[in-house]
Amino acid sequence: MNQFRAPGGQNEMLAKAEDAAEDFFRKTRTYLPHIARLCLVSTFLEDGIRMYFQWDDQKQFMQESWSCGWFIATLFVIYNFFGQFIPVLMIMLRKKVLVACGILASIVILQTIAYHILWDLKFLARNIAVGGGLLLLLAETQEEKASLFAGVPTMGDSNKPKSYMLLAGRVLLIFMFMSLMHFEMSFMQVLEIVVGFALITLVSIGYKTKLSAIVLVIWLFGLNLWLNAWWTIPSDRFYRDFMKYDFFQTMSVIGGLLLVIAYGPGGVSVDDYKKRW
């Protein structure tokens, strides 16, 4: 495993940083999963509220965009409203999480088609990243089921489905980073791309996962406050809703990263491979 070891000085700095990350995890482990879940479902909660306050506007959009008539447009808005609020409540209460995630995934797919997001690569990347967050949420429930057999000796990775779901969720989070990139040749933009890509790659392969995810959460949160400060925009400006949408979708991905911090990268990761070998 020498290929994963840094030189002496760097190794010492990394060890200190990892110790700090572990200390953070120990202090927050009781409430971090709850914060992670709330962040992850925040985009659905915000969108459900928006559906309620823009009920007529959403129906009109569907009728004009798809020529579907009043009845189908009303069904669309009703499903988007109740299909987000109820699953969010189920997830926060830890009730039928698999069903709740399935409903939320159907909302993501439905909105991707209904709002023509398939042809907007930036918004499509965000939706895919949110799907990755839902996979991480499902993997968390697999972790809870596996814990019923705590204390029983096992060899290797005892929960393959959970490990592959964690891997898929981490990889899909890459799409959030891609949607945030601005290809401008300024020093700060190049620095953002290099640092962000390095961090998201480390999280995806599961190397120094908790440390990388903590740094990425801080980086994404700061970037989110800078790029998507929707509360500074007057309520009569149409792009306020777009900024709010971007803000809460980024918060959902941050929630996914917090789940990675809380539960680790799983069996299909460099960190786990190092432990076993």
Curated annotation (Swiss-Prot):
Transport keyword on record: yes
GO molecular function: cargo receptor activity
UniProtKB keywords: Endoplasmic reticulum, Membrane, Protein transport, Transmembrane, Transmembrane helix, Transport
PROSITE patterns: SURF4
Chief localisation class: endoplasmic reticulum
Pfam families the UniProt entry points to: SURF4
Gene Ontology CC entries for this record: endoplasmic reticulum; endoplasmic reticulum exit site; endoplasmic reticulum membrane; endoplasmic reticulum-Golgi intermediate compartment; perinuclear region of cytoplasm
Disruption outcome: High rate of embryonic and larval lethality. Some mutants reach adulthood but display severe accumulation of vit-2 in large granule-like structures in intestinal cells.
Localization terms from the record: Endoplasmic reticulum membrane
Similarity comment text for this entry: Belongs to the SURF4 family.
Function of the protein: Endoplasmic reticulum cargo receptor that mediates the export of the yolk proteins from intestinal cells by recruiting cargos into COPII vesicles to facilitate their secretion. Required for the endoplasmic reticulum export of the yolk protein vit-2, which is synthesized as a lipoprotein complex, from intestinal cells. Involved in endoplasmic reticulum exit sites (ERES) organization.
Name by which UniProt lists this protein: Surfeit locus protein 4 homolog
Species of the source: Caenorhabditis elegans
Gene that this sequence comes from: sft-4
